[in-house]
Design a protein with these regions (language model features):
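Acidic, low-complexity intrinsically disordered regions
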Residues: 1-188
Length: 188
């Protein structure tokens, strides 16, 4: 049996719980399951018809699960991941929110990076690295995906890291930048 004070203390130090007012708490799973969020794939990802998840699902999914193990669903079906070469610059940008000390380990420990060990890197990073990715064509249901379109996401299961994804068409040509897009970029 746990006293009320002990339970409160445990909840206050847990990384899975948000402390509210008047000694009330809510779990991350309770806050983020079913909530919508979005991101805009980079030009490189659009050109390669594949996205890297990286930090884009933080804080919505369980932080104990690495991004290459997240289960992606689209139109009620599991989207199978694959492996593809991406520029190291994109990889570094896409994992940046994990923090400076964690970016490189997350990138090099990706399950698709089977040929390049972190210990083999001497003085400079490789230009490209093989990472786990998900095909945009499967997420978009076979419809064309354009640079500027967004991926709309919703956590289906926080504990199992299941994320539903669909495409929000920007409705703009590649040459037109909307006011909303400018504001979104400024916010990010």
């Amino acid at each position: 049996k746990v006293s009320k004070n002990d339970a409160s203390e445990i909840l206050q130090v847990s990384e899975y719980v948000f402390s509210l007012v008047k000694n009330e708490f809510v779990t991350k799973a309770g806050v983020f399951t079913g909530r919508w969020f979005s991101f805009k794939p980079s030009r490189e990802e659009v050109e390669k018809d594949s996205i890297i998840i990286g930090h884009r699902c933080i804080p919505f999914v369980n932080p104990e699960v690495p991004p290459d193990s997240i289960c992606v669903m689209a139109e009620g079906n599991v989207v199978e991941s694959s492996a593809r070469e991406f520029s190291m610059n994109l990889a570094m940008d896409t994992f940046a929110l994990y923090g400076e000390g964690y970016v490189i380990p997350y990138i090099f420990n990706d399950k698709s990076n089977t040929s390049l060990a972190l210990s083999s890197v001497q003085y400079s990073m490789p230009q490209e690295i093989r990472l786990t990715c998900w095909p945009l064509s499967k997420i978009s249901g076979g419809k064309p995906f354009h640079y500027g379109d967004r991926i709309i996401c919703r956590v289906i299961s926080w504990s199992d890291c299941v994320v539903e994804m669909k495409v929000q068409d920007s409705g703009l040509s590649d040459m037109v930048i909307s006011d909303e897009a400018v504001q979104r970029e400024e916010w990010y």
